[in-house]
Amino acid sequence: CLDSLAHFTNLRGDFTTDEELACVVKHLRAFEDKILREQDKNRYDKKKIYRPIKVLCLGNHDIRKDCTEIERIFKEHGWVVVPYLEPITIEGLTFCHCMPKKNSDLMCTTAEELLQTWHTDIIVGHSHVQDYAESFNIGTGKSIRAIKCPCFTGFPPQYTGFGHMAWPLGWLEITLNPFEFTWRNIECLWK
């Protein structure tokens, strides 16, 4: 699961426990090692240096507790850390933990709803359900996509009972030109 070279790596936050954050920190090193190996290979082959964009969107669980530690850890590893509910657009992709419906306090719950509301390529988390929608923006003459990704979690909270058994756990990798995305399951890190 660490062999691919994505343009973007995106986590949607919501680290619910200290154990979960410790798991993420442990595996950040694996991401960094993969990137450093590829950069060394590019230098040796005199190719363009691989510099992926790593984005962490802080979630509602992160802001309930002191998230300065989370921010510090990820920033030290070169990640762009996005505050909760604050969208950021990088190379035409908008990232946010979750996005509200226009003029409302309610959040968009499906990828289709994200496209109908925001009319742009957008990646969000918040939910524990995966969803994808694609449409055509007449104004720009281009396809637009919305992806709802579950949160990176390794230790589902106790209150979920067995409800978490249906949750996909992991992270999203995105490649541009052509646009492709891959869901990476967290279990591959534990092998």
PLM feature segments, named:
Residues K41-N42, L58, R184-K191:
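Charge-rich, low-complexity terminal tails
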Residues E91-W190:
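Conserved beta-sheet core of the metallophosphoesterase superfamily
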Residues Y44-D45, E86, T109-E113:
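Short, flexible, glycine/charge-rich loop motifs used to bind or transfer phosphoryl groups or to couple energy/partner
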